[in-house]
Amino acid sequence: MIGQHAPTSDVERLVQRIARLEERVADLQRSLVPLRPFTPVLSAVTTDPSLGSLGSVGGDYTVEGGRCRWAATIVFDGSGVSAGSGAYRVLLPVAPKASITFRHVGSGWWYLPTPTPGFRQVELDASPGGVWARMICEAGEVTHAVPAAPSATAVLSVGGEYPIA
């Protein structure tokens, strides 16, 4: 019995070691997937907002294993900042799988300097039939007025992960 157990123990150790090595290889492969830049867009259902003369956007994403990981920042600043009108949507870098409509695709924060400066938590879900994500806050859909109108120095920072089409 003892002689028969030793090879099994060695085999079990080898199997465990191989599993750890496979996990390490997968971690290394994930770290090597290059980030791709994309230009995020903040849109509103009725009239699009204007980021202003000093406004800026930036984003990056990666696609691996049928999933998209992404991050984006949108900054309002300078003259000409306008909140637009209607519920806000954020452009996703890659179309999500159609079956995930209304499911979570990201989250982040929305810094609004007026009327009371502060950060608001936002969640994003996949809008029906497209590459847009609806913004949601504790008060409901984020709009040009909810939780407050963006003004100069407002910042939206969001990101997430979702299955792609």
Place the predicted regions along the sequence by residue.
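Beta-strand residues in well-ordered beta-sheet regions across diverse protein folds
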Residues: 69-71, 136
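Glycine-rich, low-complexity segments
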Residues: 2-48, 53, 98-101, 157-165
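Structured beta-strand segments within beta-sheet-rich domains
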Residues: 116-151
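Surface-exposed ligand/attachment interfaces on beta-rich extracellular proteins
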Residues: 9, 35-65, 73-98, 142-153
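Short, ordered beta-strand-loop transition motifs
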Residues: 62-69, 125-130
